[in-house]
Amino acid sequence: VKKIVIIGGGTFSPIRNHLSLCAPAFGKTARQLGDMFNDKLIGTPEDKEYKVEVHLTKMADPTSDLVTNDDIEDLLAKLLGDKSVRTIVMNCALCDFDAAIDDRGFHGDRLKTVEGEFNLKLRPADKLISMIRNVRPDIFLVGFKTTTNASEEEQFLTGLKMMKSSKCNLVLANDTVTRRNIIITPEEVAYKSSIIEDNMYKGGHFRVVGEALQKQEREDQLKELVEMTLARHDLTYTKTKFVRDDSIDFYDAPKTFKDVMRFVIGKGGFIENNGNGFTPGHFGYKVADGIFVSSQRKVNHNDVEKNGMTLVKVRGDSVTAVGSHKPSVGARSQALLFEKYPQYDCIVSGFIV
């Protein structure tokens, strides 16, 4: 049986006896997701193949033993050692900081209000979500990122930055003021519900969107997140052996490929909108069966004539990449397409506006 694991609730960072810093979260979303996953699996071929587990912290479930970030780290270590765990939905609100007043820690003398003010030192806590796919790159990871009254672009970029740093496969970014929920994918596409925007402007004027619509938009996005997870989480993972060498010169590519690439770049097909200098999209051309030249990962594709490309060799489940950069994430899709459609030898995927 394969496991889909959902972790929810908030954690505490102990300061002194009866005093803690906390990340307030009470498990509602984690419970909802658990029910939604089970509802989606019922009656499908995956129903008997998958088991949904929900782990809640003590803040969300009084019977739980999960209290601190350390407890969540211990839980993750157990989950990562369990090969039946295939998907982790990390909805847990972890304390971003470890709090301390002095070196005596939690078991120091109890603080007394009669002693007046104390200075609290906050130290950034480790980002536990980042450990998941560093240890188990085969796990499908869903993360969550919160913003406060951010613009839609700021919200997207914040969620995207978190996705890239933690290697999440999907991220749900939600804003606590605008109530906007955006699902972000590794291909840097945002999926959102239009229900709030559609109802903000009625009868020729703007109006306040009610709580019921905000709740419906949130539930719609959670359902979409579940559907996208189930559609993507069982895709195969192939580890690539990377050999660092010189890039493949763009000028060695077929003329047709170079002409199309220059056209796409000229039309703004590779948009730098993620705040990190990289561009979404991918491209490549076939050299021979199982051998092709692909775009580079973590670069600006508009500079391909300067940066060059990466050689990729596929032999069964073995993939070897040679160049100055790893190939684009889309290189695996390119390999599958070249194999399925041998009559084609060039692929260009961008975002033409």
What residue ranges belong to the model's regions?
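Short, well-ordered loop/turn elements at secondary-structure boundaries
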Residues: V1, T279, V287-A288, Y341-Y344
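Short, high-confidence coil segments that cap the C-terminus of an alpha-helix
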Residues: S84-V85, C168, L230-T236, Y344
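A cross-family phosphate/adenosyl-ligand binding-site feature
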Residues: V1-E227
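Long, non-catalytic terminal segments
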Residues: E219-V329
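Short, conserved, surface-exposed binding loops centered on an aromatic residue
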Residues: G81-D82, M131-V135, M162, G284, ...
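Conserved active-site beta-strand-loop modules that form the wall/rim of enzyme catalytic pockets
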Residues: A23, G290-V293, Y344-V348
